[in-house]
C-alpha cells in the first residue's frame, strides 16, 4: 500500500530499489518460475512498479543520498523482532520510517526514527516528512549518532554470538 500511495501521490519523492520488483507478484512455485523466466526475456522491461529504479549493488549508495527510508519489517507486531533494516538506514545517516516490532522503543530510542504507527494514513506521514525542518532532521541524526556510539551494544555481532553460544550451552547442559 505504501509503495502504491507514493507512486500515485509523490512519484518524484519516492524510489523503489531491489531485486525482483520488476517481476510479477508471487505465483505458485513452478508456474511462477516459468512466468519469471519469460518476463526476463521480454524485449520490453515489464515492471508493475513504476517507481522501481533497478537493482543496486550496495544499498548504502542509495540510502546515503536519501533523507528518509521506508523501513517496514516483514513481520509487524512481533516483540523484539528488529532486523538490520533500521541499522542500514542509521549507518547511512538516513532517517528511517519504521514499522515493525511493537516494543521498538524498548531497544531503540524514539527520537532515532519516525514511528509509522503515529500516522493514521500516508498523507499525514508524507506531510510530516515534507514539513520537517532542517533543525529537526539534524536532531534525528544527532540522536542516531548518540545511540550508535553509546547504546547499540545489544545489536552487535559479538552480542549476537554470545546469545547463540549461551543458548547452545543451555541446550547441551539440559
Tell where the protein language model's regions lie, with residue ranges.
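Nucleotide-sugar donor-binding catalytic core of glycosyltransferases
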Residues: 1-114, 136, 151-152, 163-173
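C-terminal amphipathic helix plus adjacent low-complexity
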Residues: 122-174
Amino acid at each position: 500500500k505504501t509503495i502504491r500511495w507514493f507512486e500515485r501521490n509523490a512519484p518524484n519523492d519516492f524510489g523503489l530499489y531491489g531485486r525482483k520488483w520488476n517481476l510479477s507478484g508471487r505465483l505458485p512455485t513452478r508456474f511462477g518460475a516459468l512466468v519469471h523466466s519469460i518476463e526476463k526475456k521480454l524485449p520490453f522491461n515489464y515492471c508493475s512498479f513504476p517507481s522501481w529504479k533497478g537493482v543496486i549493488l550496495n544499498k548504502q549508495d542509495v540510502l546515503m543520498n536519501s533523507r528518509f527510508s521506508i523501513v517496514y519489517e516483514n513481520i509487524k507486531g512481533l516483540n523484539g523482532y528488529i532486523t538490520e533494516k533500521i541499522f542500514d538506514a542509521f549507518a547511512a545517516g538516513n532517517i528511517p520510517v519504521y514499522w515493525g516490532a511493537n516494543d521498538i522503543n524498548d531497544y531503540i530510542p524514539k527520537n532515532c526514527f519516525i514511528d509509522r504507527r503515529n500516522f493514521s494514513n500516508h498523507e499525514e506521514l508524507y506531510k510530516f516528512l515534507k514539513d520537517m525542518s532542517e533543525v529537526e532532521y539534524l536532531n534525528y541524526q544527532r540522536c542516531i549518532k548518540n545511540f550508535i556510539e553509546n547504546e547499540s551494544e545489544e545489536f552487535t555481532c559479538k552480542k549476537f554470538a554470545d546469545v547463540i553460544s549461551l543458548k547452545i550451552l543451555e541446550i547441551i547442559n539440559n
